[in-house]
């Protein structure tokens, strides 16, 4: 798939940004503070699950701490700037280090879109039967893929993008994850004492997660 090389046009009179897809944006991109917040929120939720603090969900022995990846973030930002609530193609999620990344997306008008997006993905935990953690498989009638990706143990990198449409005020948040999860018949994470199966030891910043 060929992507259009886009440019950012700043319209001084209205402070709009226009990308190659024709979407006019009143806001776009994440600054360092926003990146740190969404990364921290992901890791705190992973830590919550790993340490057995999520009701009905077992502890995890091998869940990794997530780290920010600029290539994932650049792809996610391009996805957000389409201002379309639609998953991107494999080509649009491809990275040099990890191959094709996983993707979660959000569109809405809440005042805190970054936190809202992650919270909505995580809330799918209420429909997760713990039995599926040992051998993941899709089951009809429940949307759980965003949560499963959020807590997939072997995922170690994340990058997110953000854009707000000037036309309707809709905010778009896309996060890309690598290595991606949701592999059928693979474990989401290994049950056991938190961080007991870490290959490189336990995270000092997020005890219960692996380095």
Curated annotation (Swiss-Prot):
KW Disulfide bond (keyword) present: yes
Membrane-crossing segments per the record: none
Keywords: Disulfide bond, Protease inhibitor, Secreted, Serine protease inhibitor, Signal
Signal peptide annotation: 1-20
Changes after translation: Contains 3 disulfide bonds.
CDD domains for this protein: CAP_euk
Location within or outside the cell: Secreted
GO molecular function: serine-type endopeptidase inhibitor activity
Pfam families linked to this entry: CAP
Function: Shows trypsin inhibiting activity. The protein is highly thermally stable, since its incubation in boiling water during 10 minutes does not reduce its activity.
Protein name: Scoloptoxin SSD43
């Amino acid at each position: 798939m060929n992507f259009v090389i886009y440019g950012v046009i700043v319209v001084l009179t209205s402070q709009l940004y226009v990308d190659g897809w024709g979407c006019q944006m009143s806001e776009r991109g994440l600054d360092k503070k926003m990146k740190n917040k969404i990364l921290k929120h992901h890791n705190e939720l992973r830590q919550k699950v790993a340490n057995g603090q999520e009701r009905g969900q077992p502890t995890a022995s091998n869940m990794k701490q997530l780290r920010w990846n600029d290539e994932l973030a650049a792809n996610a930002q391009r996805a957000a700037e389409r201002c379309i609530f639609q998953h991107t193609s494999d080509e649009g999620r491809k990275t040099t280090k990890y191959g094709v990344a996983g993707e979660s997306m959000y569109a809405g008008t809440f005042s805190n879109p970054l936190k809202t997006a992650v919270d909505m993905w995580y809330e799918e935990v209420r429909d997760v039967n713990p039995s599926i953690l040992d051998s993941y498989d899709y089951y009809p009638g429940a949307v759980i893929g965003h949560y499963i990706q959020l807590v997939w143990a072997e995922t170690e990198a994340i990058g997110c993008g953000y854009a707000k449409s000037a036309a309707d005020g809709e905010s778009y948040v896309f996060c890309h994850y690598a290595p991606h999860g949701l592999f059928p018949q693979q474990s989401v994470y290994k049950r056991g004492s938190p961080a007991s199966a870490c290959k490189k030891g336990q995270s000092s910043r997020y005890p219960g997660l692996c380095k």
